[in-house]
Amino acid sequence: MNAIGPALSLFDPTPAVAARSPDPLRDLPETDNSPGAPERLLRINAEMRARPWPAPYDATRHVIRFGDARDLSWIPSESVHLVVTSPPYFNLKPYESEASGRQLGRIGDYEAFLGELDKAWSECARVLVPGGRICCVIGDVLVPRRAGGRHWVLPLPADIQVRSRRVGLDNLTPILWFKIANRTNEAGGGSAGFYGKPYQPGAVIKNDHEHILMLRKPGGYRQTSMVQKALSMMQRDEMDAWMRPVWSDIRGASLRQGHPAPYPVELAERLIRMFSFAGDLVLDPFAGSGSTAVAAVRTGRNSISVEIENSYIGMARGRVLKEIANVARCGVQAATAHLTVER
């Protein structure tokens, strides 16, 4: 496997000093407490969404690496600002077989599966900067009646929340993402009949939601430049809609992408914009088809994607390159992006 090499520059969590600011950044307030600072920052943010960003925020770097989420030793400690990921489902999704010996989603024992996930969360906690967080998109595991003689649910999100405390992470209020479920896979190949008979005693509540867990590494708030704040702010309508515990305006991703458990780029994009700044480094240790990396390109963040299935690396590469070309054509925000693939 190649060393991380030139991509090592991604891992400096200290914001670079921006070049001389073009309009409209000339009107930046000196501090958050300057007269009219919030209004000025919001106005600048709205204008900069349609303009090229200043250096160094005008260029991003993205690394897709063949590797295991349980071993991120090649990433320096406290170098990642945000983790956005969706770990494999326990023993239900049809993941590829080439990495079956290491693929978490193919572990047959639930407690052993949780133990292996703990190793990944421990590595994420190590590489996160103090105060950084993990946004984990995960759903309950539905076990169909024909698989075990009875219908039951493994509360995977709740188990992750409880066990994350063992690796030093704090739980924050999660988001309930209401979506249209991909029933065939999530129910182990089921159909509408999986949900039970139409009369009440045999009914089963439809599973059309996932949890977005918020796991935070203890630490204070980061000091960032006023330029970063201006480029990264949410507008008031976005804040009103996004900072709620239930989301219902983003649909689940199509399985036609070629991955058994994709999640939409719009979901990753929103989480990145909510919990990171322009120029930050975002990690996805379970990269899959590359939705987090695509969202990072789109939002002017750097990214590292780690994936254990070779076939998904090619898929992620194609999607990221397509997004890089699209962003370059638009000529706004971080219009220059570079991709490195390491196997």
Residue ranges and their predicted role:
Residues 1-315, 343:
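Core catalytic lobe of class I
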Residues 314-343:
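PRPP-dependent phosphoribosyltransferase catalytic core
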